[in-house]
Amino acid sequence: MGNLAKPDYATSLFILYKMKKKPTKSTNKLKVRRLGIDTQKEHVAYIRADSHVVISEGFEALARVRIKKGILSIVASLHIVHSNLLSKGEIGLSEIAFSSLNIKNGDMIEIIHLEPLVSLGYIRAKIYGKTVDEKGMNEIVEDVVLGNYSNIHLSSFITAFAGDHMNLNEIISLTRAMIISGDRIKWKQKMVVDKHCIGGLPGNRTTPIIVSIVSALGLTMPKTSSRAITSPAGTADTMEVMAPVNLSMKKIKDVVDKQGGCVVWGSGANLSPADDILIRIERALDLDSEGQLIASVLSKKVAAGSTHLVVDMPVGDTVKLRSIEAANHLKILMEQVGNAVGLKLKVVVTDGSQPVGIGLGPSLEAMDILSVLRNEKNAPADLRERSLLLTGELLELAGFVKSGKGYETAAKVLSSGDAYKKFRAICKAQGGYTEPEFAKYRHDIHANHSGIVRSIDNRKISRVAKLAGAPDHPRAGVRYFAPLGKAVKKGDLLYTIFTETEGELYYALQYVKIESDIILIK
């Protein structure tokens, strides 16, 4: 008799799941032990190798398992323990797994094999060049939100759909699937305006200024923003320096009802939760692909109840979009997807050749925002102009003013001080205002020769700010004083690095020594 082919691991799990007798109550139950292990957002379980459950179920390390307590259940990655950390009758849980099940130390929980995930087949098909239809995209996103995917599965999804591997229908399907994956806000107002920047340009923190001007004019602008993925600060990170941003949906509605606008963290309101999960992995992989970018942006806008959207699209040698051709391609795609999901949308292509403002990092960017809103003499002119340009475009898109009158209207509100008053009122409504501060340590970087500033590498100056500790340390980052075209002499100040620890300052300075072309002076 010939040898039978050995089934692969996935097939074995399927056979085990379908053919195995239903376990008795005692077979698959273990006593919970809280281990205090931080695995970020990934559910992880720990069981001894000689546990009766491991032996009876045939569990292997990194197996995906379902853990149940009453009506609650989670999916976790299983780690096998070969020590006395746990007893044979115990199961250890990571912090996120423990809190998700709402249990206590010593509770009994059940552990079983995870049923096969059909949606993984769609990802495999995509890897081999197939197209994923709307049904497949819905199943993928549903499994993402339910926590059925491990970090490995999430990484494979992001990689399979990265670059230009998504066609228009796939992007629309992903956007719609992400919209229905979470809550949606419905407003009393028929028109709700919004703004987004595709990112990649450090210091481009126009949002709080735009929200303040628009809200002061009486329009509704509930701005849900993201945290940084690959940059020194996201809008939510920067706003959080000055006011709470992790608000419930009920609280968001209350703030907007009172003030007409808000600037909050999108995931705090459970808008497009699939996007929040994917962003965590994209940040680790340093990937931000075209189709997923569009789906991420537009799904949250629709979920937030927006009807009119202006998109800031910076173009430059060291930002996400390197050419006008690339910007126009993304512009067309975004407008097509926006139309498919019911958004009135306008893309504004802007200059991305250098950082905006002075600060790079949450607290330092917050200082720039306040300087513009307060109409201070030394406020960054480029941040002010960008904010007014985009606000004007939004006012015209909404039909609030005639074509060509948007900038002028926005400038009057800003200059009058009404925008700053509105900003402070929004901060108070969100939970209270806090003045931004500098980090503990600082180090000045000077020009080593005279000349004209010819170029600034946005990615590298951002890297300096991140090595300094931003955005995790909100007060850390860079203050930048050498814009394009500026004549500098040897010894002139180019930028200042701010850190909370001496170690982070050391790493930032080591990077500056290695990368001599962060600022090119000729």
Give the residues covered by each predicted segment.
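Acidic, glycine/proline-rich low-complexity segments that act as flexible tails and inter-domain linkers
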Residues: 114-202, 241-242, 422, 426
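Self-splicing inteins and homing endonuclease
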Residues: 177-198, 254-280
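A glycine-rich helix N-cap at a beta->alpha junction
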Residues: 238-262, 332-338
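Phosphate/diphosphate-binding glycine-rich loops and adjacent basic-rich segments that engage nucleotide
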Residues: 259-308
